[in-house]
From Swiss-Prot:
This is Putative tyrosine-protein phosphatase OCA1. Belongs to the protein-tyrosine phosphatase family. SUPFAM superfamilies: (Phosphotyrosine protein) phosphatases II (SSF52799). Keywords: Cytoplasm, Hydrolase, Protein phosphatase, Stress response. InterPro entries: PFA-DSPs, Prot-tyrosine_phosphatase-like, Siw14-like, TYR_PHOSPHATASE_DUAL_dom. The active site is at C116 (phosphocysteine intermediate). It is found in: Cytoplasm. The gene is OCA1. Residues 18-178 form the Tyrosine-protein phosphatase domain. Its EC number is 3.1.3.48. It comes from Meyerozyma guilliermondii (strain ATCC 6260 / CBS 566 / DSM 6381 / JCM 1539 / NBRC 10279 / NRRL Y-324) (Yeast). GO terms for biological process: cellular response to oxidative stress. It holds the Pfam family Y_phosphatase2.
C-alpha cells in the first residue's frame, strides 16, 4: 500500500557545510548556522573545537551555551610564541594543531565536532595531522584533504605542514583515546 505525502515535514534536518564523520562520534564541518541546529541536536555534542582566529557567530555561541556544549577556541590561542609566530590570516601552527589533536585524542570530549569557517583548510589541516597520527600514508591524507577543498583546490603549504608536522609532540594520555593513534590506512 502506498502512502501519499501531502505536506513535507516542517522540521528539516540540514547538516553544516562540509559536514562529514571522521571517526565514531568525531565529526568535521564548517561553522554551523541556525538552520543546522536540528541536525546538531541529534549528534548530542559534548565538545566543539573552533579552529578559526575570528570569533564564531553569536547564534552559534548561544546554541552551544543553551545545549551545554563546551567550545575549545584552539585557533585563538594567545601565548607569546604563537602571537609572534603566526600568520594573522591563518591561525594554525604547531602549537594550535598539537592542542587540537590532544583534545581529539581525549575520548572524554566525545561526541565532538571540529570546525572552522568553511570546514576546508584549517579543519582539513587538523584532520590531516590526525590521520598521520593514525598512521595513514601521505597519499591518503592528501586525497582526503583535497576532497573538502572543492574547485579552489588544496593549498600546497597546508599539505607540506601536514607532512612536516611532528606527531611525536602530541601527548596522548593512557585511557584518553589512544586507539585514535593506532588506526592505519
Amino acid at each position: 500500500m502506498s502512502r501519499k505525502v501531502v505536506q513535507p515535514p516542517s522540521l528539516r534536518i540540514i547538516p553544516p557545510l562540509n559536514f562529514c564523520p571522521v571517526e565514531k562520534q568525531l565529526y568535521r564541518s564548517g561553522q554551523p548556522s541556525i538552520i543546522n541546529q536540528s541536525f546538531l541536536q541529534d549528534l548530542n555534542l559534548k565538545t566543539i573545537i573552533w579552529l578559526a582566529s575570528e570569533e564564531p557567530q553569536e547564534e552559534f555561541l548561544d546554541y552551544c551555551s543553551m545545549n551545554s556544549i563546551n567550545i575549545e577556541f584552539v585557533g585563538m590561542i594567545n601565548d607569546d610564541y604563537s602571537y609572534q609566530n603566526v600568520n594573522p590570516w591563518d591561525s594554525l601552527n604547531e602549537t594550535t594543531i598539537k592542542k587540537a589533536l590532544e583534545l581529539i585524542c581525549d575520548r572524554n570530549n566525545y561526541p565532538m565536532l571540529v570546525c572552522c569557517g568553511m570546514g576546508r583548510h584549517r579543519t582539513g589541516t587538523v584532520i590531516g595531522c590526525l590521520r598521520r597520527l593514525q598512521g595513514w600514508n601521505l597519499a591518503s591524507v592528501s586525497e582526503e584533504y583535497r576532497r573538502f577543498t572543492g574547485a579552489r583546490g588544496g593549498r600546497i603549504l597546508v599539505e607540506l605542514l601536514i607532512e612536516g608536522f611532528d606527531i611525536s609532540t602530541v601527548e596522548i594520555g593512557s585511557g584518553k583515546g589512544s586507539s585514535m593513534a593506532r588506526k592505519k590506512r
